[in-house]
């Protein structure tokens, strides 16, 4: 890894990892090459970026302390606001580094996602993005089958939280890092994709590999609860109709994506994720 990348990665990790996050560097070009022009990140190909994901430890190390410290007068989505707080803390801690942050849930005015998180996780080498195209002679016919990322240490017990872009820092010599193919067999991939698409409520697809750590029962209850009911579950008041703070504004300062080429498989409805079953 280039010394400059290693230095920046260490700085970001020192800020985020104690709270249950992981960080992976990648080049914007690796992401853009897999997607149609409408989804490209509008930066030169060698631009450095970091993928950020949360591990099972984030719930206790970040979310609970965040709720106790009352960083927001109004809570709308505690997990998203907690993640936003920690990502912003990186940009505030290193003001000399220009960073632009895109959270996994951010969309353009036309509702197009600002980042395809699973594609970013794959190119960063963080988690393998298993899709229908990875199953030879698949058995699903005309059924819609969405893809899912599997982490080599946590299986499906993690969540992709966003991307940190560093405009002006280019790393053309950064070596690509392939994600570990931890579900290498056809049968295993069929079981994984069917579990994710048809039985995600039972959590079993997340054990596609034996994980080092799973979500606690407390986390599972929280993420199984419909979002509109999660504040009540935590004993928190429902939000008012009015925005509370500027901290709840979108994270990204991105401009309109530039044009370029690529394969539809990473975006087509047949492989795009369904409504999320939870982090």
From Swiss-Prot:
The modification Phosphoserine is found at residues 247, 272, 276. Residues 243-257 have a biased composition (Low complexity). One of its GO terms (molecular function) is FAD binding. It catalyses: 2 cob(II)alamin-[cyanocobalamin reductase] + 2 hydrogen cyanide + NADP(+) = 2 cyanocob(III)alamin + 2 apo-[cyanocobalamin reductase] + NADPH + H(+); apo-[alkylcobalamin reductase] + an R-cob(III)alamin + glutathione = cob(I)alamin-[alkylcobalamin reductase] + an S-substituted glutathione + H(+); apo-[alkylcobalamin reductase] + methylcob(III)alamin + glutathione = S-methyl glutathione + cob(I)alamin-[alkylcobalamin reductase] + H(+); apo-[alkylcobalamin reductase] + adenosylcob(III)alamin + glutathione = S-adenosylglutathione + cob(I)alamin-[alkylcobalamin reductase] + H(+). Pfam families: MMACHC. Substrate binds at residues 104, 115-118, 129-131, 149, 160. Can utilize both FAD and FMN. Cobalamin (vitamin B12) cytosolic chaperone that catalyzes the reductive decyanation of cyanocob(III)alamin (cyanocobalamin, CNCbl) to yield cob(II)alamin and cyanide, using FAD or FMN as cofactors and NADPH as cosubstrate. Cyanocobalamin constitutes the inactive form of vitamin B12 introduced from the diet, and is converted into the active cofactors methylcobalamin (MeCbl) involved in methionine biosynthesis, and 5'-deoxyadenosylcobalamin (AdoCbl) involved in the TCA cycle. Belongs to the MMACHC family. This is Cyanocobalamin reductase / alkylcobalamin dealkylase.
